[in-house]
């Protein structure tokens, strides 16, 4: 079989395609990567119990706990290589919910010492600053969120075992239909009209339940393979990933969960960002010390260089 010779790599190669790059004198091709983690840039300040938004190459991390009893308002952006500190939250907090993109995100709920001091505060991020907006109807911590922008968000779950769900329209929160299973320390993905809720506690030892939100109601769908709590999630209702508290990670394809490659570092309550189950970022967390490290997850068609020596 003849291998195509090209001066530069094809712009849109497909799985199984092989070529010879005459500029680099290498044989390359596209293979399927079932899933792998790689080290990425360190955050400027290590912390746990933070929230995240955005994608693998344009992420936002905010809030959290830097050390026992020290709650953070810090916000950082990630550009695919390095983290940069930007303007703080107005209200320092940990165990908060959040989602959106790097230029349009929402932070809500959480707690401050003592740990039982939950709050209802909501803040909107416009890419430069956080602005206080209308509060959640029910203050809580250890909740999850799903949303694409700071004008459309879903908040659900919370401690202790709360099933409450609220929808944000850019101005106010409105209570909508509850989760079927009340829980906290869960994760979420998707938007306020097409969301996914998974994992959490209470349960022995961790919940495997997954629920799908259609804009009106929650419906139980296929379970996780392994119970997850103190975890993070990102993606869409049909393409999501769950990561933490341990090394374990799983991928959702819209119907079922599949166990994928272990994380490099076991991290509890990390921040997460990602567009789908082929591209994600996990950052911060603790096990038991607080981390500033982050790592990338990638799967699917990947260009590799073949050793033909």
Residue ranges and their predicted role:
Residues 1-309:
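Polar, enzyme-active/binding microenvironments
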């Amino acid at each position: 079989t003849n291998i195509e010779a090209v001066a530069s790599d094809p712009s849109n190669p497909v799985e199984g395609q092989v070529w010879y790059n005459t500029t680099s004198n290498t044989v390359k091709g596209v293979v399927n990567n079932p899933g792998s983690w790689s080290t990425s840039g360190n955050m400027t300040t290590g912390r746990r119990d933070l929230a995240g938004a955005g994608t693998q190459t344009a992420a936002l991390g905010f809030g959290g706990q830097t050390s026992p009893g020290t709650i953070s308002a810090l916000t950082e952006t990630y550009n695919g290589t390095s983290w940069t500190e930007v303007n703080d939250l107005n209200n320092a907090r940990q165990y908060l919910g959040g989602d959106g993109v790097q230029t349009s995100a929402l932070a809500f709920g959480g707690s401050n010492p003592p740990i039982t001091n939950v709050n209802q505060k909501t803040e909107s991020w416009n890419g430069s600053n956080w602005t206080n907006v209308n509060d959640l109807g029910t203050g809580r911590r250890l909740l999850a969120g799903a949303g694409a922008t700071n004008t459309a968000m879903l908040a659900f779950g919370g401690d202790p075992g709360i099933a409450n769900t609220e929808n944000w329209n850019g101005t106010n929160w409105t209570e909508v239909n509850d989760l079927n299973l009340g829980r906290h320390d869960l994760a979420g993905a998707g938007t306020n009209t097409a969301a996914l809720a998974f994992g959490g506690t209470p349960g022995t030892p961790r919940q495997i339940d997954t629920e799908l939100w259609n804009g009106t109601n929650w419906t139980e769908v296929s379970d996780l393979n392994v119970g997850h709590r103190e975890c993070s999630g990102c993606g869409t209702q049909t393409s999501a990933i769950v990561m933490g508290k341990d090394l374990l990670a799983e991928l959702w394809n819209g119907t079922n969960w599949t166990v994928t490659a272990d994380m490099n570092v076991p991290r509890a309550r990390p921040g997460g960002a990602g567009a789908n189950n082929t591209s994600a970022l996990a950052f911060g967390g603790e096990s038991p010390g607080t981390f500033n490290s982050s790592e990338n997850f990638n799967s699917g068609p990947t260009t590799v260089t073949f050793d033909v020596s």
